[in-house]
Amino acid sequence: MQTEVTCPAGTIVGVERDGVRAFESIPYSRIVGAFDDPLPAEQGLLIDASVPRPGTASLSVTTPGTAKPGADHPVVVWIHGGRFEHGDHTETFTNPDDFARAGVVQVRVGYRLKFPGFLPLHTDAPGHYRGVADCAEALSWIQRNIEAFGGDPTNVTVVGQSAGAAIALWLARRDHYKGEFRRVLAMSPAFPRAPFESRKWATRGALSTPLTREALNQLYRDNEPKMQRGYQRFRTQYITDCALGPHPLDATELAEVDLVVTSTREEFIGHGAALDRAHLG
């Protein structure tokens, strides 16, 4: 059954099923160039959020079917993992329907990956990564709009796994934290073991282009497959590590927010099962 929410972002049309409302792949930002910082999404739009559409600058919201504006349900923001190079906000193994039936609004956030998301540029501020900036823009969108979905913007928990946990912790740094979430649950956070400066030569060799915003935006526009091939060449040199990602995390730089850092015992069990299903194990 069709359902809709009207909020500052616009009128968002989703679906209601089995006591749960789902709003899929809502754009939360505008990305002019692949290596540019995100801009806030346009407001006042009519948005078809009835089906998931993979995309980096989108998020999905799942709410209890009875949620009304101002209901103040707690909000869980899920940032997916994937070694900073794969994953998507459309993943549903986080069981959003179960969260909704328990009275929790869940938001799943997509962000830029690989070189567009995590290749530092010399003109960037220290500690700045576009993939992290995407997630920060998503949190700002949530602050502006989630109350219309029945969520409480003052009771937001950011949850991440692997690369997503690293991003969650990075967002909790004092130079990034803007008070848009109350607590963090970081499960098996994964960071590169070496700074990007030690890998810059490999990046230049893989892309054969200057590492400037203008040159990289041009390469992405003109020949995205070449950039993807370049990333594959680059990352094969770091198969036992995250090839890119925030680095380094200093715990003394974290803001005063409630924080749980833990590990997941069976986070890779699905990989073996997938290989078995494909008869590759």
Regions picked out by a protein language model, each given a short descriptive name:
Residues K178, R183-G281:
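Substrate-access "cap/lid" subdomains that shape
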Residues G160-A163, S188:
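Catalytic nucleophile serine of serine hydrolases
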Residues P64-A71, D97, E147-D152, D175-K178, ...:
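Surface-exposed acidic, glycine-flexible loop patches that form ligand/cofactor-binding
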Residues F149-Q161:
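Alpha/beta-hydrolase fold nucleophile elbow
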Residues T56, P126-E147:
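Alpha/beta-hydrolase active-site loop
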Residues A165-H176:
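Short glycine-enriched nucleophile-adjacent loop
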Residues R130-D134, S162-I167:
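Active-site loop->helix "elbow" adjoining a glycine-rich segment at hydrolase catalytic centers
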Residues M1-P126, R265-E267:
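Non-catalytic accessory segments of hydrolases
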